[in-house]
A protein has these predicted regions:
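Short, solvent-exposed amphipathic alpha-helical segments in soluble enzyme
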Residues: 41, 73-75, 134-135
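Structured helix-beta-strand junction loops
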Residues: 38, 52-53
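Structural helix-boundary/capping segments
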Residues: 26-27, 32-33, 44, 52, ...
Length: 148
């Protein structure tokens, strides 16, 4: 399926993504089983979290927007990023929970670039998540125009 697409279009894919795909091809069944066990533990922890809280609110990204000429962040607060995707790990890591998540703009950096939050709710609570997001959007009332 996608392996065929990768083989036929490899020269058109960004080199970092090619490396990710090639690493994926080398993952063993045992490693996948271990990863699924870790993910199961994550589900249990998230479930416990939502016994006490209705929502998890966190930044959409670990860093402020950066120059368009910079392909990716190499360091955050003095800590080196091991891969080109570490700087937005908080964005994709939450998707591993299978919980509904929404991102909202909430303001602008000191240089005028947009910043946001993501809100996560327990599984199958999309209606509550959307209602809560609407309340936040109304309270924050970020200027609807683009800063660029």
């Amino acid at each position: 399926m996608l392996g065929d697409l990768y083989k036929s279009k490899k020269d058109e894919i960004l080199v970092d993504i090619v490396r990710n795909i090639e690493v994926g091809f080398k993952v063993s069944n045992e490693e996948i089983i271990t990863a699924e066990k870790i993910r199961q533990d994550l589900f249990i922890k998230v479930d416990k979290f939502f016994e006490e809280y209705d929502f998890l609110i966190c930044p959409t990204c670990s860093v402020l927007p950066f120059d368009i000429e910079t392909p990716f962040v190499k360091e955050i607060d003095g800590v080196a990023c091991k891969t080109y995707i570490d700087w937005f790990a908080i964005t994709f890591a939450l998707t591993l929970t299978s919980c509904p998540i929404i991102s909202l703009p909430v303001g602008f950096s000191s240089t005028g670039l947009p910043v946001g939050i993501q809100i996560m709710s327990k599984p199958r609570q999309e209606d509550k998540l959307l209602a809560f997001a609407k309340v936040i959007e109304e309270k924050v009332s970020v200027n609807k125009s683009s800063p660029i």
